[in-house]
Amino acid sequence: MATPAGLERWVQDELHSVLGLSERHVAQFLIGTAQRCTSAEEFVQRLRDTDTLDLSGPARDFALRLWNKVPRKAVVEKPARAAEREARALLEKNRSYRLLEDSEESSEETVSRAGSSLQKKRKKRKHLRKKREEEEEEEASEKGKKKTGGSKQQTEKPESEDEWERTERERLQDLEERDAFAERVRQRDKDRTRNVLERSDKKAYEEAQKRLKMAEEDRKAMVPELRKKSRREYLAKREREKLEDLEAELADEEFLFGDVELSRHERQELKYKRRVRDLAREYRAAGEQEKLEATNRYHMPKETRGQPARAVDLVEEESGAPGEEQRRWEEARLGAASLKFGARDAASQEPKYQLVLEEEETIEFVRATQLQGDEEPSAPPTSTQAQQKESIQAVRRSLPVFPFREELLAAIANHQVLIIEGETGSGKTTQIPQYLFEEGYTNKGMKIACTQPRRVAAMSVAARVAREMGVKLGNEVGYSIRFEDCTSERTVLRYMTDGMLLREFLSEPDLASYSVVMVDEAHERTLHTDILFGLIKDVARFRPELKVLVASATMDTARFSTFFDDAPVFRIPGRRFPVDIFYTKAPEADYLEACVVSVLQIHVTQPPGDILVFLTGQEEIEAACEMLQDRCRRLGSKIRELLVLPIYANLPSDMQARIFQPTPPGARKVVVATNIAETSLTIEGIIYVLDPGFCKQKSYNPRTGMESLTVTPCSKASANQRAGRAGRVAAGKCFRLYTAWAYQHELEETTVPEIQRTSLGNVVLLLKSLGIHDLMHFDFLDPPPYETLLLALEQLYALGALNHLGELTTSGRKMAELPVDPMLSKMILASEKYSCSEEILTVAAMLSVNNSIFYRPKDKVVHADNARVNFFLPGGDHLVLLNVYTQWAESGYSSQWCYENFVQFRSMRRARDVREQLEGLLERVEVGLSSCQGDYIRVRKAITAGYFYHTARLTRSGYRTVKQQQTVFIHPNSSLFEQQPRWLLYHELVLTTKEFMRQVLEIESSWLLEVAPHYYKAKELEDPHAKKMPKKIGKTREELG
């Protein structure tokens, strides 16, 4: 028999003579196919089915010789199996003989002894086959009792077939349980929806009856009081009128009869009128004096018998940074105590400024191109113009989409799929859904869905549309984002993130309740947007009445049109005014410093108008804002006032709203933003845009499973989007902090789609839940990398979400119902086994807020670190997060507690909302609530059940991952940074300056075999350094001779 290498060489040599070419993969394919065939004719038939070989003559002879040469495994019976078969045969043979009636008892004893020895042997075998073989033993014993003679029946089956039958039975049973669970979820949703509607109708009727009854009772009780109040008001008014009449009458009499002698009666009447007038004046003066004294004296607080007001710290929830109330009080006191100099009319004088920057500090820009607009340039808006409030309808009519309303509605009516191209600010997002609503697309209970890639955009746009329609947010217009749903039964316009629309496919695969689906900001090519494209394309073929609108702000709409079977493109002119593009003469070494210098340079040299600066993330934005504020303080009154306003996703809502407020007179506003201001937000008043040319992008390495958020150059499409922000209200300027050559040669045309640089575990789980099994041939706009898709399938199989055939299991179906990462879902499901679902829900909620629990003010770093250390518990960072939330809950969810412990109240409140939603979903996935009562071992085991994929152990060279053997490091902020435990579990692996493990947990290696015996082997978890080495003394060179 030839060796595998020799056989492969022989096949390659023969292929030269048969086909005239030879290739290693072809040879391996032929050898593998021959090994799987049971006969030479079957091998020849398989080769003939490929339609690549002419199996006549030499080719057929080659196939026959290859089949004879290929080695095959001989079916060798295992010793244990042979012993079992012999024992079974002996047992059947003993049962078949009955010589004497008196020998029944001894025969039964023999049978019992043989059965007991057979049972002992079976205990040593694999536990997977135990149940089936016990059933076979019972069947055999029943046959032996019933039959007194006869030949032995052959019931033995090969081991491999036995194993396959067991696996197939378990798979079919799991599929039945999965389908039953899905049906229960659908029925529960249906019942809940019907009950809600019935309850709401009944409740509305009862509320109306109660209001009518209360109105009648209140009217009867309030009429006397209202009469008294009206009488008092009338008397006060009559008193003033009578007093005025009396004064006028006295003035007339004094003027007419001042020189005339009056009778005694007339003199008494005049004296009486004067006395009445004086008393009325004294009464009025006494009342005014009483009011004045009442405002200056102290009054005891009155008892409030109504509903008590909320605590002050909860009212100030969205007050920005912790301690905001204290800071405002200090500023008010300091402002009142400070002495100010200068004339009072100094503010009305026209200030005169001069360039305060040194010549070597300025940055030289070169004007290169101009983006043309479709309107004549007008004067920049002054502060007085910015303060003028236009009506909402006038604003709607001024948007670029308004003149094309009828044409757009006609195009939507004539085509099922329509691609809409229009720059940000043209009115696509806010106006088109309203046009459809006015046209009647929401009749008969239908709804309109509009997706947004960002949560901030979905919330702000929904609020704006509700304001324009004159309805309350949450009624006819609402939004739905992850862990927050602001909709009701009356909602017909739903703004949602694209991920939320994906989740609606689980309960409504055909989107039957929607008449129009609008995918907005499609040019951003987020992960969920690309998945939506493939799903909506299939739904549109199934539902011809469904309207699909794809809105994009870039010129790259041909890709979308081709994908949707050459759908028509409707273009809306967006840029109203021209924009001048300026490039630097030379590259800038530090773009952050260049941004600060350029902002001050624009501030002192350019006409009025606000500035928009694009930076990569929160850290850079805060650093730039601090540098700008510091330099403005040093320059003092040499420059005009400069308002520095940041905008990023984690910023509190009230601070985000400040960027939309009008700029005060005589000042200039500079907005420092991430790429969220490229397309998702439109800020009025922006004239100047500063573009460093960088952005943050998430990348994913499927071989190591590591995500990294790196600063990379932006694409040309993003650069053009940023420049377009300057031409919304007047002719603008865009200053790019890179050269024109870099723009032409170093920037990519478009941004790499997110589906090609991120993990696909959630996506694969969702598609499998929707019944889409052939992921390789799914209709992606841009297919993801093969390795990423393969790793996602491998992880889901390891987590138990998929079986060996790639089908969704019951656990996988439950995991798909939870809107979190698959590993986090598995951790929540495993918490039921370890009776710690209460604690696991808290850990999952805290892990969902993106490492933004603690904060470190630059002036209180030591205090913040000490406060963080006070939360440390033995075991790891997950228990620290659990401890933080538990103490916060014990304090009554107080914001003051967060301020004192340097914890971000906004993040904690979001974690509470996430936990409440996950707790509500536990009933949906049929997991009961339980608590471990402080037994953190069970909590750590439940976390290990979900994150056994992310493990590392300590070696002599540091930490290495168990499977990939990649060097990793504990993050310095971790509670285990200085302890260095032997085995670790981490939440995520992030590449920054090093490969850091974030949120680590100390575990034991035996737990991995307990929760994932299918993934780890005992040999992998052995500690090579724990073995004792033989004691041996080395010899010197002289001793060795």
UniProtKB/Swiss-Prot annotation:
Q: Which GO terms describe its biological process?
A: antiviral innate immune response; mRNA splicing, via spliceosome; RNA splicing
Organism domain of life: Eukaryota
Residue positions where Phosphoserine is found in the record: S103, S106, S107, S160
Q: Which GO terms describe its cellular component?
A: cytoplasm; nucleoplasm; nucleus; spliceosomal complex; U2-type precatalytic spliceosome
Helicase ATP-binding domain: residues covered: 409-573
Which top class of enzyme applies to this chain?
A: hydrolase
- PROSITE patterns given in the database record: DEAH_ATP_HELICASE (PS00690), HELICASE_ATP_BIND_1 (PS51192), HELICASE_CTER (PS51194)
Specify the protein name: Pre-mRNA-splicing factor ATP-dependent RNA helicase DHX16
Impact of altering H523A? Answer: No loss of pre-mRNA splicing activity
Query: Which species does this protein come from?
Result: Homo sapiens
Region annotation Disordered: residue ranges?
101-207, 371-391
Q: Which reaction does it catalyse?
A: ATP + H2O = ADP + phosphate + H(+)
